Swiss-Prot record:
Class in the EC hierarchy, top level: translocase
Name assigned to this protein: NADH-quinone oxidoreductase subunit C/D
Cellular component aspect of the GO annotation: NADH dehydrogenase complex; plasma membrane
Native species: Bacteroides thetaiotaomicron (strain ATCC 29148 / DSM 2079 / JCM 5827 / CCUG 10774 / NCTC 10582 / VPI-5482 / E50)
Reactions that this protein is recorded to catalyse: a quinone + NADH + 5 H(+)(in) = a quinol + NAD(+) + 4 H(+)(out)
GO molecular function: NAD binding; NADH dehydrogenase (ubiquinone) activity; NADH:ubiquinone reductase (non-electrogenic) activity; quinone binding
Region described as NADH dehydrogenase I subunit C: 1-144
Enzyme Commission number(s) of this protein: 7.1.1.-
Length: 530
């Protein structure tokens, strides 16, 4: 169980600033909204009630990690100090909490909803919310609001709402998406232009928001597993690995070495699968049609391996609490061992037709630069963070599975541009092959599934687990009250920090560069919208 320190709201901002400056807690790993219910006279004195937030922080300097929480009992006007001036990603994280719980973050510059319609009534993640009564099915188009609210604290302690315009009347604003192919899903960017130069981007999320975190509260633990595959569908195995690992950690379950080997190999096959699709999609975005076919051709070999063992190609449904759904197919080892030399032998062709292409290089080199400091402040993990010089690989920071038993290099570049983000992923394909090669002939015997009770109840407490997904750190925060269903199950989306940073990355770039920048950030919209 994770120990979480409580801080009263009045002292929150000063304490967070102290942790950032003195303890070097520069990485806001996760920010989770909570509804601990209404206070009752029967409650024990230590029972936490009210609406609040759980923060997970980490120092990229010392590696120290800490979790904090705060709460307010006023449900009519819950107010908590904003930390968006300390960590840039808090801007989007706090908007998400406001959207779900109605908590107003004092000092936040843009207190709009993040996922739901602007005319949505109520806050759906509150335990006492009834959305069907307040929100009948609406078939009308949503009105676009250009007004934001900045919540300020007056010297006398009162709150002041200051309305601000997103765009000026003279600004030329273009919509990129939500139906534009280069947005890689239903994501809408409202782009302010001066000629061809980008001056500002307003990212609009939520077009395929499905309320997965709300659904989890009415599902048993085994039932929640299926929904993780529907988040980042190019990292389905890794997502479910994180959730299973979190539940197993909470229940004190130690899976067999065979399961650890299988999960690690599957995670790395998934990483290669995702990076090959990244290569193809980026090539198509930049007009390199031949390169597009290379990635899809070779990705099929991995999907065939998945289908044979898991029964699915994209959505595998393979990991389960205590192990995996079925043992490896008899052909699994043979087919994986055939794929390794094949991929190694052909990767040079990928570089010949695209990496070394002068047009591709001119579209990516020096374009969309993200500094290391901004990567950390926005929480841009994965290939994006490592391309900016931040060694943030969860497999190295907090080893899980059998990553502590294999030799592999964490790929880090320092340029922070589109080309560096591209090269990180291409190099990671080779490192994933190296990891798989060390494991494939050494899979130990043993059970592929631990015996579980028919009804799974997780001990009361708070738990966090994370894996290195194809796009970065995918985290799971679980709060249990000892029931067969989670009290709160929150996912740290890998893609939300990437979209949060896109305004900073693109300012001053040309509109055509937005395509290359979005392609190399490699976000997946269902992972963001959840």
């Amino acid at each position: 169980m994770q120990e979480i320190q409580f801080i009263v709201p009045a002292a929150l901002h000063d304490e967070m600033l102290r942790l950032r400056n003195e303890k070097q807690m520069d990485f806001l790993e996760s920010l989770t909204g909570m509804d601990w219910g209404v206070a009752d006279e029967k409650d024990a004195p230590e029972k936490l009630r009210g609406l609040g937030v759980v923060y997970h922080l980490e120092s990229t300097v010392t590696g120290e990690r800490i979790a904090l929480k705060t709460a307010v009992t006023d449900r009519e006007r819950p107010e908590i100090p904003s930390v968006s001036d300390i960590w840039k990603i808090a801007d989007f994280y706090e908007r998400e909490v406001f959207d779900y719980y109605g908590i107003v973050f004092v000092g936040h510059p843009d207190m709009r909803r993040l996922y739901l319609r602007n005319d949505w009534v109520g806050y759906p993640m509150r335990k006492d919310n009834d959305p069907e009564k307040d929100n009948p099915l609406c078939m009308a188009n949503e009105e676009t609001f250009d007004t934001t609210q900045e919540i300020e604290l007056n010297p006398d302690g009162t709150i002041k709402n200051r309305e601000m315009k997103l765009f000026g009347e003279e600004e030329y604003v273009v919509n990129i998406g939500p139906q534009h192919p280069a947005t890689h899903g239903v994501m809408r960017f409202r782009v302010s232009l001066e000629g061809e130069i980008i001056r500002k981007i307003d990212a609009n999320c939520g077009y395929i928001h499905r309320g997965i975190e709300k659904m989890n509260e009415s599902l048993t633990y085994p039932q929640t597993l299926a929904l993780t595959d529907r988040l980042d569908y190019l990292g389905a195995h890794q997502n479910r690995h994180a959730l299973c690992m979190c539940i197993e950690k909470a229940m004190g379950i130690e899976v067999s070495d065979r399961v650890k080997y299988i999960r690690t190999i599957m995670d790395e096959l998934q990483r290669i699968d995702s990076h090959l699709l990244f290569y193809s999609a980026l090539a198509m975005d930049l007009g390199a049609l031949t390169a597009f076919f290379y990635g899809f051709r070779d990705r099929e070999k991995i999907l065939d391996i998945f289908e044979e063992t898991c029964g699915g190609r994209l959505i595998m449904n393979y990991n389960t609490i205590g192990g995996v759904q079925a043992d490896l197919h008899p052909n699994f080892v043979k087919r994986v061992k055939e794929f390794i030399p094949y991929m190694r032998g052909i990767i040079h062709e990928y570089h010949d037709i695209f990496t070394g292409n002068i047009i591709a290089q001119s579209r990516m080199k020096g374009v969309g630069v993200l500094s290391r400091e901004d990567a950390i402040s926005f929480g841009c993990t994965g290939g994006t963070g490592r391309a900016s010089g931040w060694a943030c690989d969860v497999r190295k920071r907090i080893p899980y599975g059998v990553y502590d038993k294999v030799d592999f290099q964490e790929i880090v570049y320092t340029e922070g541009d589109c080309f560096a983000r591209y090269l990180v992923r291409m190099d990671e394909i080779m490192e994933s092959l190296k990891i798989i090669e060390q494991l494939i002939d050494n899979i130990p015997e043993g059970p592929y599934q631990e015996k579980m009770k028919p009804i799974i109840r997780v001990p009361e407490g708070s738990y966090y687990a994370a894996v290195e997904g194809s796009r970065g750190e995918f985290g799971v925060f679980l709060e249990s009250q000892g029931d067969k269903m989670p009290y709160r199950l929150h996912y740290r989306a890998t893609g939300l920090p990437l979209v949060a940073a896109i305004d900073t990355i693109c300012r001053g770039a040309k509109i055509a560069d937005l395509i290359a920048i979005g392609g190399t950030l490699d976000y997946v919209v269902p992972d963001i919208d959840r």
